[in-house]
Amino acid sequence: MKRERHQDVFTERLPAKAAQDAKQLRKLAGDWLKLRRADAELSQADLAARLGLKYYTFISQVENGFSRVPTEIMGAWARELGLEQAAFARHLLMYYEPELYRLLFGAESK
C-alpha cells in the first residue's frame, strides 16, 4: 500500500508548552523524521545504506530521541528524504537548539 505524502512537511511547530528538555525535543524531532522517512518509503536499513552508515540502528536511535542527525550528514539525509536541505536543517534546529532557533528566526517563525 502506497502512503500518501504529507503536503507541507515543514509546517509543524513545537507545542507552546513543550518542556525544553533536550531528550523530549529530540524525540519530537525523531517522530518528525520517522514520518518523513515513511513518506519516502524507506526502511531504516535503506536510509542507513543510502547515507553510508555502518549500522542501521543509528537511524532508530535518532528516531527514538537518543541521538541527533549529525551536521555532517544532514544535507544527505534531507536529499534521501526528498526534502530541501536548508529547510530540513532549519526545522531540525527548532528541536535541537530551540533558543538558537528563536534568536535566528524569531519566536513565531516556522
Regions flagged by a language model, labelled:
Residues 3-39:
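A short, Lys/Arg-rich alpha-helix, primarily the initiator
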Residues 5-8, 70-88:
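DNA major-groove recognition helix of helix-turn-helix/homeodomain DNA-binding modules
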Residues 40, 51-52, 62, 81:
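Core residues of bacterial helix-turn-helix
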Residues 62-63, 73, 92:
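DNA major-groove recognition helix of helix-turn-helix
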